[in-house]
């Protein structure tokens, strides 16, 4: 059963200080943490294994395997929404990411398949696709980085986001988690974040 927006109220600054108000979660399918780190230009031998607290203190990224996916967790960083990074990182596979920065009220969401953007939420622009007249429609100006395929598999989630029960909320308030779950099959939980050990590194030139 897919979660509802209210199911993510646990992800709060009170429980996750230093993360919930400035985070980026990125999911990459079919790779290992070591392969993801290598694609990011980081030498595996320069990485270390850390807990979530250690990752937050370092304000860097950490990678952990979750089933067939790798989850990248970032504190106060936005590699997962930098198109110059995530477009090549998605080569031959699927990448899903979402980002929030509380101080600016800034939300972003990406779904990329093999270098082509399938769906996006952009700060101050909104969703790239929405349901109008019962159909998924493209809302942004088209450019070559976008896939021509419509993200029909998201129709149910978009309808729920815009339902009378769950009125439209900012992505970080639940919709981004719902969309990521639909696209990856992974439900974000406190246990997943708190009990994982992360392969932690620094991307060259990111600081």
Residues covered by each model-derived region:
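Short amphipathic alpha-helices in soluble, non-transmembrane regions
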Residues: 35-43, 88-89
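Short, extreme N-terminal leader segments that mark the start of a protein/domain
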Residues: 1-32
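Residue-level signal for secondary-structure boundary elements
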Residues: 18, 48, 97, 188-191
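Short, conserved charged micro-motifs
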Residues: 30-39, 81-83
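Long, compositionally biased intrinsically disordered terminal regions
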Residues: 4-5, 10, 119-121, 125-207
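Short, intrinsically disordered low-complexity segments
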Residues: 48-123
């Amino acid at each position: 059963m897919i979660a509802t927006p209210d199911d993510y109220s646990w992800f709060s600054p009170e429980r996750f200080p230093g993360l919930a108000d400035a985070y980026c979660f990125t999911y990459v399918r079919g790779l290992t943490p070591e392969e993801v780190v290598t694609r990011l230009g980081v030498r595996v031998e320069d990485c270390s294994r850390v807990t979530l607290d250690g990752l937050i203190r370092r304000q860097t990224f950490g990678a952990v395997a979750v089933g067939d996916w790798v989850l990248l967790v970032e504190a106060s960083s936005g590699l997962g929404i930098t198109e110059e990074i995530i477009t090549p990182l998605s080569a031959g596979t699927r990448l899903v990411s979402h980002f929030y920065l509380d101080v600016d009220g800034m939300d972003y969401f990406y779904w990329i398949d093999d270098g082509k953007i399938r769906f996006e939420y952009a700060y101050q622009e909104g969703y790239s696709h929405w349901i109008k007249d019962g159909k998924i429609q493209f809302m942004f100006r088209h450019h070559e980085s976008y896939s021509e395929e419509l993200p029909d598999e998201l129709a149910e989630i978009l309808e729920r986001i815009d339902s009378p029960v769950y009125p439209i909320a900012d992505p970080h308030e639940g919709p981004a988690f719902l969309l990521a779950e639909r696209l990856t099959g992974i439900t974000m939980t406190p246990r997943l974040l708190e009990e994982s050990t992360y392969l932690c590194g620094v991307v060259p030139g990111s600081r």
